[in-house]
Amino acid sequence: MAAETLGAADCSTSGCHGGAGDKSSQFVTWSQHDVHARSFAALTTSRSARMSEALSITDASVSPRCVVCHAPLATVDPALLGAGVEPSEGVSCVSCHNLPGGWIRGHTRSDWTHADRVSAGMRDLNDLYTRANTCVACHQNIDPEIVGTGHHPALVFEMDGQTQDEPRHWRDPAAGIGAQAWFVGQAVALREVSWALLNGRAEPARSVPVADSLSWLLDRSGLDFKEQPFGEAGNGPDALASTVEKADLLAKRAARSWDPSFAPTALRRLSSTGADFIPGASPHLVQASRADRLVLALDRLLSAMPAPSRPAGASQSLDRLFHLAQSQPDFDPAAFAKELSRFSGALGVSVSAGP
């Protein structure tokens, strides 16, 4: 008989994850501070009602198109739900850590290692490739018709920054954050948008610039990735299939083997891409999309530096780059290139001294 699917309340006893202190307060952190605990509530707002009307959805709170991400327990066979478990709890424990199995009874035991938990069936979220695959499904992959209503934003998956913003219910404050998490996330994001285009699951006008900007970003960062052309000649099935494969392999490799010296190297290389933003070097929309991804990358790579090593003036210049990148559709590539040069100059020897 299949194990019952547990709700968050089943994990909230004081002897498990509902106690006090850093080691057992995970339920309190999730329920009081984490937006995932309120994901179902988003389906009951007036904004959701307008979106539902545009999509001819009678009730977003039970529509498979909505609950798959906002209330994953609604997708579980009701016969398998434990007593009192309701989809309204949103994105809860089992949504990320895996459905109940052999790992449930022993995962809080002090004599169990992380490897023991994983071998028993708990999802290995310490592995950045596994984590990226878990998160990207709802933090990037979204029905283009939903975005087309004008009431739901197009999502940008950036694993490092989004993990940093997450209220921490894990013990190691530095686990799974930094340049490695950023890079793995971007490679997975490229794989997913390319797969969606290949399989007709994305709206090309929105998604081709995203795929191009991610491919460009990974290529310019310098970690052994050959830029895959996206455009009239390179956006066909063969090119997309190749990108899906390459990006997936790149994400796996970066998750399993990482040289810390890559972060300053990538920061230096990406800050030196001003020539790509000379007016006319690429179509205007392409440059705007690349700028949007670039400033996010510079932010994460700069944040990965020890605070005392961050050059004075770099943060202020980065703020100006964010402002310029967010000026679509009035993006000014010349102004962006000029400010990018200032940012590169502010980095100076602190970064150029890297390998």
Describe each PLM feature range:
Residues M1-S25, T44:
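General N-terminal leader/first-domain-start detector
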Residues E4-S12, V62, E89, R131:
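Short metal-coordination and nucleic-acid-contact micro-motifs, chiefly zinc-binding Cys/His arrays
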Residues C11-T13, C66, C93, C135:
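Short cysteine-rich clusters marking metal-coordination/redox-active sites
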Residues S12-A20, H70, H97, H139:
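Cys/His-coordinated zinc-binding microdomains
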Residues A20-A54, P78-V91, L99-V295, A334:
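Primarily the internal scaffold of c-type cytochrome electron-transfer domains
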Residues I57-H70:
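Hydrophobic alpha-helical transmembrane segments
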Residues L73-T75:
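A cross-kingdom signal targeting lumenal/periplasmic-facing segments of multi-pass membrane
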Residues T265-P355:
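A cross-kingdom marker for long, charged
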